[in-house]
């Protein structure tokens, strides 16, 4: 678990991964070298797994987004599902879930026909019994960074 200072540094980097250590230092009250040491430590411990950019999927030609519920044949391991789905560049996220489905995959496609082809290929995987999909009409909220649950959770 990150302490408050590390969390503020991570939040600053999540907002802008190109932000300088000096700029972050001004935000959190540390020198640039102190921020760098903390970032290096956070990378070494795996708290920071990389630095990236956020790109609008439509700018790359991904015009259609959907979620696919995957219902697996009995005794399918999460590792089998992961190996099956990681072959599809269109699958940008996948998780095992509670409820009737075994997993949910987020899929981007160039258009409806492309989405349909991806859905057919996923449904044809040996571990898949059936699928159910929903298409995104309008993304309402996408968060790439948030504070820790202890500080931000709305309690009763």
Predicted features along the sequence, with ranges:
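A compositional/biophysical signature of low hydrophobicity enriched in polar/charged and small residues
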Residues: 1-156
């Amino acid at each position: 678990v990150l302490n408050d200072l590390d969390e503020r540094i991570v939040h600053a980097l999540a907002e802008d991964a190109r932000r300088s250590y000096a700029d972050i230092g001004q935000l959190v009250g540390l020198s640039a070298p102190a921020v760098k040491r903390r970032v290096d430590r956070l990378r070494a411990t795996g708290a920071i797994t990389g630095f990236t950019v956020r790109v609008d999927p439509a700018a790359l030609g991904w015009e259609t987004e959907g979620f696919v519920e995957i219902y697996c044949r009995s005794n399918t391991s999460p590792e089998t599902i992961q190996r099956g789905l990681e072959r599809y560049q269109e699958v940008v996220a996948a998780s095992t879930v509670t409820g009737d489905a075994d997993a949910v995959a987020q899929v981007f496609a160039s258009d409806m026909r492309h989405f349909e082809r991806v859905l057919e290929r996923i449904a044809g995987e040996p571990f898949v019994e059936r699928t159910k999909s929903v298409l995104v009409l309008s993304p309402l909220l996408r968060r790439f960074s948030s504070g820790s649950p202890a500080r931000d959770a709305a309690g009763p």
